[in-house]
Amino acid sequence: FNALTGANQYVGNWPGVTVEKKEGKIKSVAGTDGETLCTHGHEMTLVDLPGIYSLSPYSMEEVVARDYIINERPDAIINIVDGTNLERNLYLTVQLLELERPMIIALNMMDEVAKNGDTIDCKRLALELGIPVVPISARTGQGIDELIKSAQKLIYAAHTQLHEGFHIEPDDVYDDYT
């Protein structure tokens, strides 16, 4: 959250640190053409939800996170996944995928993964899950700009796609001048 917004909130990589949602404006990153990708002058608001391992409403953190995701229907979800404990975190990822919201995985702690001599095939993980996966380290800032660009592209794509079943007849868009 802090790396993405420039804020200085107390955050951690375990459930219970954040018990309520926090909001911040996401910093903007210029694209290769020098223009800010897809924000078109609009700020993006990032909502930090409590760290959870599932959407089951058994704890206050889970209730807050679940209610926000289901009721507020955010434009997109950035799912922060601990790369040092992938299996435990993918349970929540699968639940979030079932909600059919645009989502990107920020595979965090990749500096620790490398330090431990491990590797994660992010391209294969993205292919298997069907969503973008961006390796990051919130501690070092590695991958944060790429994450922001990927999130901007995801939101832009979600807003520009025609809804399923939406149909325009060419005759409907022309004024009748006869």
Give the residues covered by each predicted segment.
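Conserved nucleotide-binding/hydrolysis micro-motifs of P-loop NTPases
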Residues: A7, G16, G51-Y53, G83-E87, ...
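Preference for short coil/turn "hinge" residues that link or interrupt alpha-helices
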Residues: L4-A7, G12, E62, N79, ...
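Canonical P-loop GTPase G-domain recognition
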Residues: D111-G165
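Helical mechanochemical/support elements of P-loop NTPase systems and associated helical scaffolds
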Residues: P15-K22, T45, P57, E61-V64, ...
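Long, well-ordered amphipathic alpha-helical subdomains in the mid-to-C-terminal portions
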Residues: L162-T178
